[in-house]
């Protein structure tokens, strides 16, 4: 596959296609480094405040356990910020555009829809903001969970350290999630490519979107942007949506 310098309106989106294509992050054992200033003991430490980590934290806290939750990024993880919520909000906007486009089939006159990308982004980020309080630091602290918004590292099999805190726990859950697999395609890193972490904040809607990966996420984005008026090309080395 050859690559060329992208035009201002041509974008590449990289999507993981299988679980095996995704890379766990943030929990590799390492040296503790400088001494933290706060020492904690807990029944349970959870690394990662995405769907899995928050569910575990809420359940454990409700059972009366002393829970410490580490998260270096956004509360809510991929699902709230870069996955389920924004993708479904984008799909809902795209469905409205397609409904208007097909109104003539039902005897209803309508002009071809135009897309206000800034308004679409506002709809997407409004959906995130509506759900965010459920996953917020304040809510979990209200449940009795100690939330530490720092990068977590293993000091030993029972101890987690961050910039300010050292926590020893009976049990540790690694719920660090994943990130999009970036395939080793020559020239790809010379392109301003997109992933699920950046596609919902693009300054402009692309005229042409090339999606690498025909899994569920890739095909969701393909349908949404095609319905919103972009030209879309999907590249998949196996079968679209798997076998």
How would you name each of these model-derived features?
Residues 42-69, 211, 218-227:
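N-terminal Rossmann-like FAD-binding beta1-loop-alpha1 element of flavoenzymes
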Residues 50, 151-153, 215:
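Conserved acidic residues
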Residues 47, 126-127, 212, 243:
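Residue-level marker of alpha-helix boundaries and capping positions
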Residues 203-240:
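Rossmann-like NAD(P)H-binding beta-loop-alpha module
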Residues 2-6, 10, 14-42, 58-65, ...:
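Glycine-rich flavin
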């Amino acid at each position: 596959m050859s690559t060329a310098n992208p035009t201002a309106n041509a974008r590449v989106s990289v999507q993981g296609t299988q679980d095996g294509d995704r890379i766990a992050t943030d929990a590799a054992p390492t040296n503790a480094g400088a001494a933290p200033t706060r020492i904690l003991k807990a029944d349970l430490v959870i690394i990662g405040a995405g769907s899995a980590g928050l569910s575990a934290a809420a359940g454990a806290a409700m059972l009366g356990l002393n829970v410490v939750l580490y998260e270096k990024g956004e509360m809510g993880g991929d699902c709230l910020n870069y996955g389920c919520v924004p993708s479904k909000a984008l799909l809902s906007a795209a469905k409205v555009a397609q409904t208007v486009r097909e109104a003539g089939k039902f005897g209803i006159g309508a002009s071809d829809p135009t897309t206000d990308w800034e308004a679409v982004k506002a709809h997407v980020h409004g959906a995130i903001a509506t759900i965010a309080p459920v996953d917020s630091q304040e809510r979990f602290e209200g449940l009795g969970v100690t939330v530490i918004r720092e990068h977590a590292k293993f000091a030993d099999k029972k101890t987690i350290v961050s910039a300010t805190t050292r926590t020893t726990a009976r049990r540790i859950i690694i719920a660090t999630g994943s990130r999009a697999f970036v395939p080793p395609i020559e020239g790809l890193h010379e392109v301003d490519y997109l992933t699920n972490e950046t596609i919902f904040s693009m300054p402009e809607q692309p005229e042409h979107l090339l999606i690498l990966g025909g899994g569920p996420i890739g095909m969701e984005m393909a349908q949404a942007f095609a319905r919103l008026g972009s030209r879309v090309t999907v590249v998949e080395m196996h079968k679209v949506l798997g076998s």
